């Protein structure tokens, strides 16, 4: 199969040019002007549009069981939504397994979840929910099998203590893996939450008040120091929501420490006032939404390069699930927001079209740096000969209002309802195959491939 994309502006992280792009047998074969491929081929006219590498979302939670509920997006509906939003690769954070299980247990479970459902290419982050000799011995074998990143939690049921974190950091570093972490101070959160519950303060706004930004920032600072103690182990902070944590990361970078950080559209564009609305329960996520001042600090990090990745933390529970389980109590509500379909459009509209970032920086945040950090470069995150033919075409002339009824996930609401975006996803290609075109999903379940990722190699800081 040959596909020729003509008349568009092809953008990579290191530059852009108005040129044609030829994909053949799922791979980018040529970029240039006046390409004349051998017949037969499909021609796509991208006049007036940007031609970007397909998005790489390195933080999703599909089909996750959080104990009180299972998320309503599986690997079909979740990756379908991703495809319709211009994302062609996801790396899913696997949920916790049974108490005491091996690392491999969850990999086998999740490969079963995705095998016949994923629309786009996918991989997984390992999850370390306890530490013992068997777990530490298993890590190098998992890296050899293509899982080169693992997640630790400093909160929730399977949080690790500092000694366990140090052991994990050392072994992951030795094994060629990147440590990712959910950083919140569990003890401080538990104390604040107990105070509010005892006082009968259980409305959604108290979710945010029970998890102040200092809980997140303290845990970030602690992880930075533990990573240094563990031999300058590489560290990746997920879903940053505040400026103080970003300050700590800037300081670590200034000291040449290998640390990277992601944020998410919700922390850039939504704020804590959402909790005081009639449907405030639908904005329960952790870390919580912050105030506009923290948003501005994150946008500074987006603009000046301090933030490396924009992912989604897509973790969808329906409003019916939320209301039935929580009964109005924030502490009982399952956490998470949908967003995998909206990431690329929201960042393009609020970043590129407002002049906050360049199209090249957009590529760096949404595909190139995620691919480099997580062992997929240059197969993903790049439009160059030899790379996969993963493409998203965005028309900056079109304006769209986000409406849940037009989205493709399995949620029954969107936190972005009514947002107007300048720029529309008009086509998504995965390995040269059109899987979304002009509002219509054209992919199929099971066409996505499991990606064996390369061991971690740090990008130049």
UniProtKB/Swiss-Prot annotation:
The modification N6-carboxylysine is found at residue 151. Its EC number is 3.5.2.-. Its cofactor is a divalent metal cation. A divalent metal cation 2 binds at residues 151, 182, 239. Signal peptide: none annotated. Substrate binds at residues 156, 286, 335. One of its GO terms (cellular component) is cytosol. It catalyses: D-5-phenylhydantoin + H2O = N-carbamoyl-D-phenylglycine + H(+). Belongs to the metallo-dependent hydrolases superfamily. Hydantoinase/dihydropyrimidinase family. This is D-phenylhydantoinase. It comes from Escherichia coli O17:K52:H18 (strain UMN026 / ExPEC). The lineage of its organism: Bacteria, Pseudomonadati, Pseudomonadota, Gammaproteobacteria, Enterobacterales.
